[in-house]
Amino acid sequence: MTSAAELKKPPLAPKPKLVGTNNKPPPPPIAPKPDIGSASVPRLTKKTKPAIAPKPKVPTNSVVQDIKHPPSKKPTLNLEEREPELPESTGKSNCKDVRDPHSDYILPTCSCSSGCIHEPRTRETQCVEQLVLEPLGMKENLENSKNGESSKRGSSWDSSSEKCRGQSGVVLKASILEEKLKEVLTQQRSPCGSPGRHRAPKKPEMNGDHSCTRQIRIEFADVSSSLTGFEKVPAHHNCHPQLPRDESQTLKTCQDGSAESRGHTDSCEPENKRVASDGISQKTEVKGLGPLEIHLLPYTSKFPTPKPRKTHAAARLRRQKHVDTPGESTEEPGNSNNGSSCLLEDYCLKNNKVSVLRQNALYNQGPVDEVRPANQRALTGDSNSGGQDSVGSQKAVQQQTPSLDTDSSLTSDSSGSGVSPAVDKETTYTQCSTQPLSLPKQVTSACTDQPPATCNPEVSAPPIQKESSSSRIIPKKPQRHSLPAAGVLKKAASEELVEKSSSGKETNVEKGLHRNYLHHPGPPNHGASASPFDMPNPTSEKPVWKLPHPILPFSGSPEALKRVTLSLNNEPSVSLTKPRAKSLSAVDADRCNKPCKDPPKKTSFKKLINVKLSIGFIKSDFQKIRSKSCQHGDVSAGHPLAREPKGLESDWQGLATGEEKRSKPTKAHSAENCSLESQKVKSWGQSSAVNGQRAESLDDRILSRHTSCTGDFGPEYENVRHYEEIPEYENLPFVMAGRNTPDLGWQNSSSVEDTDASLYEVEEPYNAPDGQLQLDPRHQPCSSGTSQEGKDALHLGLSDLPSDEEVINSSDEDDVSSESSKGEPDPLEDKQDEDAGMKSKVHHIAKEIMSSEKVFVDVLKLLHIDFRGAVAHASRQLGKPVIEDRILNQILYYLPQLYELNRDLLKELEERMLTWTEQQRIADIFVKKGPYLKMYSTYIKEFDKNVALLDEQCKKNPGFAAVVREFEMSPRCANLALKHYLLKPVQRIPQYRLLLTDYLKNLLEDSVDHRDTQDALAVVIEVANHANDTMKQGDNFQKLMQIQYSLSGHHEIVQPGRVFLKEGTLMKLSRKVMQPRMFFLFNDALLYTTPMQSGMYKLNNMLSLAGMKVRKPTQEAYQNELKIESVERSFILSASSAAERDDWLEAISSSIEEYAKKRITFCPSRSLDEDSERKEEVSPLGAKAPIWIPDTRATMCMICTSEFTLTWRRHHCRACGKIVCQACSSNKYGLDYLKGQLARVCEHCFQELQKLDHQLSPRVGSPGNHKSPSSALSSVLHSIPSGRKQKKIPAALKEVSANTEDSTMSGYLYRSKGSKKPWKHLWFVIKNKVLYTYAASEDVAALESQPLLGFTVTLVKDENSESKVFQLLHKGMVFYVFKADDAHSTQRWIDAFQEGTVL
């Protein structure tokens, strides 16, 4: 390191040319160490360069600039030179850098290190050492940091701050190329890694975390080149120039790498030439960052341009390596700046991918901007007071590193927080899109604690060390909350290692986010976080991220994450490149690490998920799995923090354990962590080592993270590429919903991680009991050893223990086997068990009968005694009866008897239950009380009337109403209405029936009480049926009353035995039109009414069912009609449809039959058949009212066939209902249905009536013998010739009447004799292959007849509508054209015509 520092001390060129920036140096990039004077000179050169520069390719050599050479002198000079600038730069770097996402926190560090950058690397090494030594003092420095103080502090930790600054500069200058990334990593390692590492030696826990994180950052191969740029950048760090996303990403990577690389360059240069060339690379980067500086613009949030995933994969591989290396550096306090730098540098080179990932997240927020500011500072040196800014930035970096350590420890898991916050910030900016949105929150939280430090770039290394130490102490469980980062690390390495590396990465991302937030507060925090060891703490934070947003999408586009990874083009991230794992991404990654056990676990986990979906785990089981997974997640994420308290040894052990665990994936920590990190871990063997380190630190982290879970960073979420790989977690939402949702509140990030882990771990439920599993995850994080052991156990369990599905299956098998193992039990034993169970059930049912009876008796007491007492009390107070006793007794009808009955029943039941062991029977009590139970039927029958009486009295009697209201409001009544209690006796009989039925089912057949129970049940059923009938009768009574009230006038509708059956509206066919009529069907009559406008009904007639006939018409045209013939009135009814007509026909017919049967019962000597025959015989002409044929259905006299005209009018025969002319209806006769009243009858009926009259004994005053008073006049008129000439009708036309019943087809059709002839509506009948034409449906003579033989029928097709027209052709000529009402009828008519045309 000394030789390297010496080589680095001589600054050969103020602006080292970024040569080979694009070239990707090997993980330990060996770059020539150009002699660079003071870092300040390169800064000046950088300042001269344009603010924004294309992504310059910085050669590894240039990146290798040694910030170490002038360890303390140059930093002092820089500080002195920059002291004037320090106030400005301090303000900028502290507040502006922190707040301004453009300013690179590493740059603020570099601003302090501007001098440092100009000075040899040794200075950086010293800075790093100071950072390590001064973490505790860092907070004080931050608080006391002022422009003067910043300069002083800058000088105090010149070398370390300068190193940090140089590293930050390198970060800024890092180009997109892997070399730039590596250089950036190297630079980040130097400033951030060394301070963090120095802190790490003091506190292995923090170091482990930060080292993991920083290693991730150092992963970039461009660290060395970015170091150069970063050196220069520090001066501009406070400035917030913006670099292109690619550059910013590269810068972020470089910054992270450079921050780490600076510290690591000093220590690692011997190991990796990159460290040796760290100073040079920084200077070179400064020059190379000239283009970056060109990009140095006020910070503008830019999403990193997506870069090839190859870079991500490489970066991740390196990150894992660095994770391992940081663990070592963390473990080895001896690895001060140089050792840390080497480790970080190697790790960055190895894990450039990882660094890229974390840095990407960090870059997202502002790495590019910080890089640009660094470049500007290097170029201009004036943007932020060079020396002061550099020193201040370094101090801030140191302070931030501790604070970030705290935060890092929280976030380092996901993102290599080891990098200075500035670097993180830059990195964060570049990879904003890559980072999940949730991360910024946590970063903000972590940084929020650090903002004061951030604001003070002047903070000396000791304060930074303080913070680092404090951050060790702080390993905030919130950091765990930033488990997202931790999860990332964990994924990258192994379950645990993967969690570590992923959390480190995510921590970097979070820190980048924090830095963005800190950026606003101040870059110093970034500087503090820049320390590689700060990042591991964030790893512990990952659990928080995982819990809150295991699958939350990141605000940045997935490509942004990709870009971040791509920014480490030199180190393609395997996780990004790798196909996304299944929803078990984390577990899969772990399993990949795990040679054999991983695949089984993955399978088992899928099985577990499937089983959960299909079978549904018990909540406790789910929690168990979750808790175990949480344990692993916490252990892995929390180990770094937990280990830090333990020391380096625990970290080393953690590494070994982590590797083992990683080889054996235990649990997915967070959805993101699991997916990205796991994939990364799968791709890299390095990840296992990284995971091992992280595993060590994870134990501690778990402790701190567990604490943090309830601590600061619960809401933190890592912005990690994991969101980019959300598809891997597609299944997670279900699992998360199942587990995490309940746990989110209490699990925080660690809980999330744990939950995720549990999701992925199938075996955890089996590792520990439900309760233990749930508690263990949270408690295990508390002890690093325990957490590691738990992790190991979990790993073992994952591979060794059966999968959840297997467990479920095994549990099911156990259940089956437990049953099947019993074999076929002994029938006697089974019977005994069954008998015992039945006896127990019988006892419980008997107790239920008794208890329910006790409640019922209390209700009866309330009504019979309490209510009566309330009424009596009110009467005494009033001095007169509130209500008559008669009315009160009616309201409480039969309640006294029921109260006495049930009180005695209860008493006997209680006695039986007391002596149940001696005499197990209660049914005999019901048999004995059975006859009295029929009192319930009486009560039920009077219930409606009694309730109505109660309502009536309440309305009429205000005093009684007040008593009722007061009683109902009393506690005794429980604020229930009195009617509620009056209904209880109605419900009691059905309760008896149910209870006794259940009692009988559970009784043994040989039981003493079996027979009595059957008898008691029969009695109760009889009473229940009677009560039901009574209730139905009550409903029927209500309906009858309603109908009676709806009729206008006074009509006695309510009759004993009358039952309402059906009601509805039918159209009555009057003489000329159809009119609506309302019909009510009873079991003995048909009520025929006319609706009125008032809503009531006018009673037209009540038709008795006796002698009524109902039939449907025979004509095809009247299928909706219904003909009703009764003694009083007969008519034709038309329903709205054939179905409705059929319903009414069935209801009336069945009612007529039932009514006839009832009447026969009163005449036992006659049978039903005889009665029907007698009825046929006894219905002579005139006994029933005929159905009048509507006027429109006849156009001629049905006797003489004379056509009706305006003067020759229609008349109806009152005996047969036919339409006749006046000449044919001149006679009158007394008809029976009219009570002997004379009525017009046709000649045919008159003759028939006379015959009947002669057959019967002569009747006095027989209407047949008497004519009406005007009979003489009428006879005279009839004798006068009417002068009407009767039309002679051929006999052939009279052979068939229109209403014939044996026709082939009949109905109305429209007929036309030609296309231009008008349509006529006529009635047609086809009979005996002859077509008869009638003017109306009831005409007795046809207008014409036409044989159909020799004719043909064709359908006339209509394109626009269904064809309803068909033609009758004779020899091809149209004879007639017919049109039906619908297509169906048309087809039927065509078929009928065709049948008639064929012999």
UniProtKB/Swiss-Prot annotation:
- Residues at which Zn(2+) 2 binds: C1213, C1216, C1242, C1245
Task: Return the Low complexity bias intervals.
Answer: 50-60, 403-418
Basic and acidic residues compositional bias, start-end:
259-276, 821-838
Identify the GO cellular component terms for this protein.
cytoplasm; cytoskeleton
Q: Where is the composition biased (Acidic residues)?
A: 802-817
Q: PROSITE patterns, from UniProt?
A: DH_2 (PS50010), PH_DOMAIN (PS50003), ZF_FYVE (PS50178)
**Where are the FYVE-type-classified zinc fingers?**
1191-1250
Q: Domain DH, which positions?
A: 841-1030
Keywords, alphabetical: Cytoplasm, Cytoskeleton, Guanine-nucleotide releasing factor, Metal-binding, Phosphoprotein, Repeat, Zinc, Zinc-finger
Q: Which residues carry this modification: Phosphoserine?
A: S494, S531, S583, S670, S697, S1167
- Locate the compositionally biased regions of type Basic residues: 307-321
Q: Where in the cell is it found?
A: Cytoplasm; Cytoplasm, Cytoskeleton
Tell me, in one coarse class, where this protein mainly resides: cytoplasm
Residue ranges of region Disordered? 1-99, 138-164, 185-210, 235-281, 299-341, 367-479, 515-542, 631-650, 657-678, 768-840
What GO MF terms are annotated?
guanyl-nucleotide exchange factor activity; zinc ion binding
SUPFAM superfamilies, per this entry?
DBL homology domain (DH-domain), PH domain-like
Q: Show the InterPro entries listed in the entry.
A: DBL_dom_sf, DH_dom, FGD6_N_PH, FYVE_RhoGEF_PH, PH-like_dom_sf, PH_domain, Znf_FYVE, Znf_FYVE-rel
Comp. bias regions, Polar residues: 332-341, 377-402, 428-453
Specify the PH domain's residue ranges. 1059-1153, 1302-1398
Annotated residues that bind Zn(2+) 1 are located at C1197, C1200, C1221, C1224
Tell me which positions the record assigns to the signal sequence.
none
Function description = May activate CDC42, a member of the Ras-like family of Rho- and Rac proteins, by exchanging bound GDP for free GTP. May play a role in regulating the actin cytoskeleton and cell shape.
This one is known as: FYVE, RhoGEF and PH domain-containing protein 6
Report the source organism: Mus musculus (Mouse)
